């Protein structure tokens, strides 16, 4: 029996990206199925409804990268649906609504949350964002 894994890599140059790896459970051998080179660093990934959603960490010195991506899962390969640039914002967590209409992205480093409209597994548009500016009980810890 084969198991498929999606691995994100912060490697340099063409080593960064998404790796699709199969594990043959009988022989305990891994095999590389596909490597998708990405412009930014892929970080958090989730799979919902045969779609891989991914958060990208900005890799640009101009701070104009980062964002989200959507890939259709077809057998053992990923087919890009679209990427959504966030102009320097990088997200650290993703969640898809139960009805598959919304993608929620959060960044605990800066205390922000954004919501995106999904249409046929494509990231259509940002529909809202909030930045938290509260204070916690421990003033020595990050206050986001």
Question: What are these model-derived regions, one by one?
Answer:
Residues 78-144:
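Asp-box/WD-like beta-propeller blade repeats and closely related beta-sheet repeat scaffolds
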Residues 1-13, 17-22:
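An edge-strand/N-cap motif at the start of beta-rich repeat modules
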Residues 24-26, 73-76, 118-121:
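Short loop/turn segments that connect beta-strands within beta-propeller blades
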Residues 40-42, 90-91:
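Conserved positions at the start
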Residues 1, 47-50, 96-100:
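Residue-level detector of Asp-centered blade-edge/turn motifs that repeat once per structural unit
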Residues 7, 53-55, 105:
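Residue position within the beta-strands of beta-propeller blades
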Residues 17-19, 66-69, 112-114:
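A short loop-to-beta-strand structural motif that recurs across blades of beta-propeller domains
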Residues 11-14, 58-62, 109-112:
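Short glycine/acidic-enriched loop and turn motifs that connect beta-strands
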